[in-house]
Structures are given as structure tokens and as C-alpha cells.
Amino acid sequence: MNVNIVDLNAVDAQRLVTESLIESGFAVVKNHKIPVSELNALYVDWDNFFCNGNPGQYVTDAESQAGYFSPLFAETAKGHEAQDLKEYFHYWPGGVLPGSVEKLTLRYYDAMFSLGKDVMV
């Protein structure tokens, strides 16, 4: 699969993102305005949460699919025999976030949502 890298400073950036999404379902963008330092800080916060926090108290809500997904309940992808052993946390607006990651997560969510609107409008 080939995923194009789209420069958001390009005159036709919106068209290129759309084409990439149609072709592969993904778009990789560069020259967005979200600082890498903010993403790195977010990784540090979430790493601390998974290593030192209590993720089990944020177990996934079955209806919204928001919250903590444990590797103990890993899914098996269609056509595969082995489970996909990973842990992660889904967040949706209005969902619960651990206090230690809330501030940066919400700020990053807002920045990414704004970026998406700018690119797709």
C-alpha cells in the first residue's frame, strides 16, 4: 500500500489529501501547525499513565467504546488466528479521561480536530 505524503503548504493540499484518502484510506501530512513537542509531551503523559497509573479503573464503556482496552481482552482480526495483543485508550468528546493526561489530551484533540476541518473543508 502506498500512502502519499501531502505538504499542507501546497496550493492543492486539500485535493491531494482527498486523493490519498480515496486511494488508501490514509493521509500523511507535513507542515501542519501542531508542534512535535506537543505530541512528544502527550506520549510521555500517556506512557506514564500506562506504566504507573491504574488503567483498569477506566475500562471500556461497551456502548460508546471509549476508555481503556486491555490486552487481556484483545481482539482477533478477521482471517487471523493470533490475538492482536495491545492496550490502548479510546477517547471521544464527553468521555472520561484520567486526570494525569486530560489537559494535554484535550488540547491535542482540539488541535487535530481543527487541522482536520482545515484540510477537509
What do the PLM-derived regions correspond to, one by one?
Residues 1-121:
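Peripheral, non-catalytic segments flanking oxidoreductase cores
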